[in-house]
A protein has these predicted regions:
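Tubulin/FtsZ superfamily GTPase core signature
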Residues: 1-290
Length: 290
């Protein structure tokens, strides 16, 4: 759903979309043009039946089709998004991650873990999937669905799930903007690669603020995404910070001091890459930390 939403909204420029599923019917109803029914012999297009091992076999059956789709064109980076705990996402996503990494692509996983009411068995299966994903991608973001109940309890179900989708799209859009927008202190794909390659568990998020102390407030918002399961970055090894500034209210030298105060809390061994760029949307100020 998140991928279909991003594709139809056009909110992530410079990104192409590919759907992989064992369920042929689900693919048929998706608006995404590029899709692969994985494991047609293994599953007969009927899904993995909540069995990760069957989905893993399906992905391996379609390994060459997946590899060809990922390496065609000028692709340098792949986001793999999947739900953990069921069959297809849990079993196939790690295989797809390994295919992408073997092709030399920078590979980022963004996965969800289930609600508590979905049961212990599904949660344990999801956690095993997360473990396998950590071994199959360069960097991994984990979105905890249980937090939807805790944080958005007064929202409708569709509104709450939309918040989870936004966490995914913000990460993809943040990277897309960073690579495609020329900055005053410019960052590019090489900086993203340096930060995320073999990075482990990651936080990729965007914070918006305006007015007094907007730098500090934007940093806090970027770090305090309620749905990210691992948003404590005190032990981070790499920081990539890009600040987008409004032409009506350019960044001041004193605001750089606020940024310096934030980075001083980290170990001297942390490698920090910093850039600035003009804001190309309506927000007054954006600070992005990855």
């Amino acid at each position: 759903n998140a991928v279909s939403k991003m594709c139809t909204s056009g909110s992530v420029p410079g990104v192409s979309f590919l759907l992989c599923n064992t369920d042929a019917q689900a693919l048929h109803h998706s608006p995404v043009e590029d899709k692969i029914t994985i494991g047609p012999t293994v599953t007969k297009g009927l899904g993995a039946g909540a069995k990760p091992e069957r989905a893993r076999e399906a992905a391996l059956e379609s390994k060459e089709a997946i590899r060809e789709a990922l390496t065609s064109g000028e692709t340098r980076m792949v986001f793999i998004t999947a739900g953990m705990g069921g069959g297809t996402g849990t079993g196939a996503a790690p295989v797809i991650g390994k295919i992408a990494m073997e092709a030399g692509l920078l590979t980022i996983g963004i996965v969800t873990i289930p609600f508590l009411f979905e049961g212990t068995a599904k949660i344990l299966q999801a956690l095993e999937g997360v473990k396998q994903m950590r071994e199959s991608v360069d960097a991994l973001l984990v979105i905890n669905n249980q937090r939807l109940i805790e944080v958005y309890k007064n929202f409708t179900v569709s509104e709450a799930f939309s918040k989870a989708d936004d966490t995914l799209s913000n990460a993809a859009r943040g990277i897309s903007d960073l690579v495609n927008i020329t900055g005053t202190i410019n960052l590019d794909f090489a900086d993203v690669d340096t930060t995320l390659r073999n990075g482990g568990v990651a936080v990729i998020n965007t914070g918006y603020a305006e007015g007094p102390e907007r730098m500090t407030l934007a940093i806090q918002e970027a770090l305090n995404s309620p749905l990210l399961n691992n948003n404590n970055i005190s032990k981070a090894r790499q920081l990539l910070i890009n600040v987008y500034e409004s032409s009506e209210a350019p960044m001041t030298v004193s605001e750089l001091t606020e940024l310096q105060t934030f980075t001083e809390d980290f170990s001297d061994k942390v490698k920090t890459i910093y850039g600035t760029a003009p804001r190309q949307r309506s927000e007054e100020h954006t600070s992005e930390l990855q």
